[in-house]
Amino acid sequence: MKKAVKVTALSLALAFTSSLAMATENIAFISGDYLFQNHPDRKMVAEKLESEFKARVEKLTANKKSIDEKIAASQKKVEAKVAALQKDAPKLRSADIKKREEEINKLGNSEQEAINKLVTAHDEEVSKYQDDYAKREREETAKLVDSIQNAVNTVAREKNYTLVLNEGAVVFAADAKNITEDVLKVIPATQAK
């Protein structure tokens, strides 16, 4: 019985202390996605990346157009040989027809091989471009995220918050605990530092 009383007393003491500790916690939340989407520098960063990679995009687009033109020209060349053979076939011996068919097949294979090399080289350039763009985008995103984090820290310190959570981790919170707009207002000042 004495053990039960001690356990009960200890449980009440712990519950009372933890509720006091919780009462001193000042917790807020933010919408990280909203802050990122509405970051003052986000549009400028997108334009900067577009400008930085514009020449490469134009070069890749021109290269793709050139390849498409070469494919069309190659098909026309082979089709012209086939049409000529069909036109001349009634006048030719079967050995001559077979020889011209082999020439057409050889030409078609040669053209296809040349096109495949061009397409492979183009695909490698596209892949390299995509990797480079993704790397730069990650670098710029990290800068935006850092500025958001700095703004969150600034607002949390100013308003004496001991804990700031992202809204995805919050099941319920009063709207007064949402400091997203306060953080958004601080971001440009944080960028200027």
Swiss-Prot record:
SUPFAM superfamilies: OmpH-like. Residues 1-23 form the signal peptide. Its main location: membrane. It is found in: Cell outer membrane. It comes from the Bacteria. GO terms for biological process: chaperone-mediated protein folding; protein stabilization. The keyword Signal applies. GO terms for cellular component: cell outer membrane; cytosol. Keywords: Cell outer membrane, Membrane, Signal. GO terms for molecular function: unfolded protein binding. Coiled coil: none annotated. Belongs to the Skp family. This is Outer membrane p25. The gene is skp.
